[in-house]
Amino acid sequence: FKFKPWRSPKTIADAPSILSYLNETVDENDLRKKIQFNKKVIAATWSSIDALWNLKVEDQTDNSIEETTCNFLYLCGGYYNYDEGYTPEFKNVEAFEGQVIHPQKWPEDLDYTNKEVIVIGSGATAVTIVPSMAEKVKHITMLQRSPTYYFAAPDEDKIGNFIKKLTSDRLGYFLVRWKNILMQRVMLNRLRKHPEKTKEMLINHVREHLGEDYDVDKHFTPRYMPWDQRLCFVPNGDMFQAMNSGKATVVTDTINEFTSKGIKLDSGEELEADIIITATGLNMRLLNGIDIKIDNETLDISQKTQYKTMMFSDVPNLIATFGYTTASWTLGADLISEYACKLINLLDKKDCDYFCPETGDDVVAE
């Protein structure tokens, strides 16, 4: 958050560190009393007569339904279905005698010590799982249909930490924050302006970590240009270290079917495993999966025009956070929060009950 400095020396934080930061922020601002836990909004109906949202809320502890109202509906749940991850329809999954796990349903008591593990996928989830499991497993294989771009760098910002030591807490945080924002913009502009050179640089970067003998052309040369899809960050090069140690391997092939012992590939090779992890992504779910109606008419979001990536045409008093996709998500979310506060304060100042974006005659659908 812009108002609360991140004091950890690590710029790439793990889940416990982020949770600790959030709890600290909540406690410092006495926000816990304003948060209702284990509650899920399942339906929201806007009443133009009352200028209110009527909500149906499910209590997750006993599945009871409560009804309440609000002036403004601010959706901050992202655009994924966190209840269930995406898993392709693999042939003969039921034949596999081991465990098949999607990271979204990760069992806390999973014992993978000295086990053969296959991770299907090559995105951010797979890149996180492979090095974190490599130390304990017998062997772990990252099975990918096609390669992804990777960039390894330290998880600590030495320049940023040096700046913080020379300045006050808030000034240092402000300067480092802007340094990182500008560096991200410069990097993105370079990627887009010189895609071929950037592609060569990223592939050579992988070669430096894995050595000339590694088949980088097959396993680490994507079919697309950098930033057509997002790059994967490899903190401290941990995934490459796991591969160099021999505990982790990349296989580039397509899946024919599951077998009792593992996975048979279209090449004819069979990979054996005790555990198969399907790091194959998440399902999209817009507007938090809430059944939204405007004066009892169901909202069809596909027919609406988005305004400033946060509001929708002809939908009153609703804001949905959508952060950046080419920079830190939270930077975009923070700007939307600021705009929302200014907008609500403006309504109070003008003694208005609602706001509602409208499309003009000059708007062209794309």
Name the predicted role of every residue range.
Residues F1-K10, P16-L19, G160-L175:
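N-terminal glycine-rich dinucleotide-binding loop that anchors FAD/FMN and/or NAD(P) in oxidoreductases
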Residues L73-D215, A248, L271, F322-E366:
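Rossmann-like dinucleotide-binding core of oxidoreductases
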Residues E97-V100, N256, K261-Q303:
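Extended hydrophobic/aromatic segments used for targeting, binding, or gating
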Residues A279-D348:
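Glycine/threonine-rich phosphate-binding loop and adjacent beta-strand/alpha-helix elements that clamp
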Residues K10-N81, L202, H209, K247, ...:
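Feature captures the FAD/FMN-dependent oxidoreductase FAD-binding
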Residues E200, N204, H209-E272:
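Alpha/beta-hydrolase fold catalytic core
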Residues P5-E24, Q36, I120, R190-E200, ...:
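Short beta-strand to alpha-helix junction loop
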Residues V41, E67-N81, E116-I120, I140, ...:
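Short hydrophobic core segments
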